[in-house]
């Protein structure tokens, strides 16, 4: 199977997000890479599901709370930018302060 660098990146994000999801389900607090992967994958899937850019941006602020992540992680992530594939093409989505 031949994958482009972008496809490899998407698979890596998905794998890290799946690990983060499992750890969160066990009650563990997510670290920085897990948090970024979790939010990024959710944004990419929301775009693929057909939500608008505005809906995806808002959705990104509802995924995790400070109780879900390790101390200091929210301050390390002032924003997340994702090139997500929407039904009408690829667009850049920016979520400011993803962990309120």
From Swiss-Prot:
It is found in: Cytoplasm. One of its GO terms (molecular function) is urease activity. Gene3D superfamilies: Urease, gamma-like subunit. It catalyses: urea + 2 H2O + H(+) = hydrogencarbonate + 2 NH4(+). One of its GO terms (biological process) is urea catabolic process. Pfam families: Urease_gamma. InterPro entries: Urease_gamma, Urease_gamma/gamma-beta_su, Urease_gamma_sf, Urease_subunit. Its EC number is 3.5.1.5. Keywords: Cytoplasm, Hydrolase. Pathway: Nitrogen metabolism; urea degradation; CO(2) and NH(3) from urea (urease route): step 1/1. Its main location: cytoplasm. Transmembrane segments: none annotated. One of its GO terms (cellular component) is cytoplasm. Heterotrimer of UreA (gamma), UreB (beta) and UreC (alpha) subunits. Three heterotrimers associate to form the active enzyme. Belongs to the urease gamma subunit family. This is Urease subunit gamma. It comes from Burkholderia mallei (strain ATCC 23344).
């Amino acid at each position: 199977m031949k994958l482009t660098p972008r496809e490899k990146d998407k698979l890596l994000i998905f794998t890290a997000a799946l690990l983060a999801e499992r750890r969160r389900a066990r009650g563990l607090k997510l670290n920085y890479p897990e948090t970024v992967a979790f939010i990024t994958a959710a944004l990419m899937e929301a775009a693929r599901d057909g939500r608008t850019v505005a809906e995806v941006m808002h959705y990104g602020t509802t995924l995790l709370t400070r109780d879900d992540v390790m101390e200091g992680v929210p301050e390390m992530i002032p924003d997340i930018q994702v090139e997500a594939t929407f039904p009408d093409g690829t667009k850049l989505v920016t979520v400011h302060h993803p962990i309120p």
